[in-house]
Amino acid sequence: GFNNTINVWQLHVKGFGSWHLSPKTFVNLYAYGGIKLPFKQPYFNQRFLGYGDVFMQGYEYYVVDGVAGGFLKATLAREMLNFNIRIPPRKGKEAERIPVRIFGKIYGNSGYVHNPQPGENNLSNRMLNAAGIGIDILTLYDVTFRFEYSFNQLGQNGLYLHRKTIF
């Protein structure tokens, strides 16, 4: 809102593209950018990277506060398995099935967050890079389980587990 204590204009833009290289192989690009004006914002309004769905793989355990920035995620994925799990029929009903698709992937991320008052956060005002490999399991209602092993420029690596649904 606008009053004497808080004055902020925000613009956040995101885009996604997917291109098939073969029937089971594709490239995904996801870009995100944002800016908050004026740059001098109270700490509460400086939340940027690491909150909710706005994060970079390999930096899941970090938050980077700032007023402007963005990132690009690139993924090369291939469908490895596609099968159905059969559920026994119930009384008066036909047998049902749960579709399962498993994808192998490699990915890379690059991003930057500008913070005019970085304080103790040494991840602001520098390029952040990470890469890794992973497996995505896609099932009913676009429920996705992601198992990702990431490496970041801080010399850290680890296995990260994610779950995403449309609900």
Language model: regions and residue ranges:
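Outer-membrane beta-barrel "beta-signal"
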Residues: 72, 156-167
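Transmembrane beta-barrel architecture of outer-membrane proteins
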Residues: 8-12, 69-71, 128-132, 142, ...
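Residue-level signature of outer-membrane beta-barrel architecture
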Residues: 17-19, 76-78, 137-139, 149-151, ...
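Flexible, surface-exposed loop regions and adjacent strand-edge segments
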Residues: 10, 44-53, 121-127, 163-167
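Membrane-embedded beta-strand positions of outer-membrane beta-barrel proteins
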Residues: 15, 29-31, 74, 104-108, ...
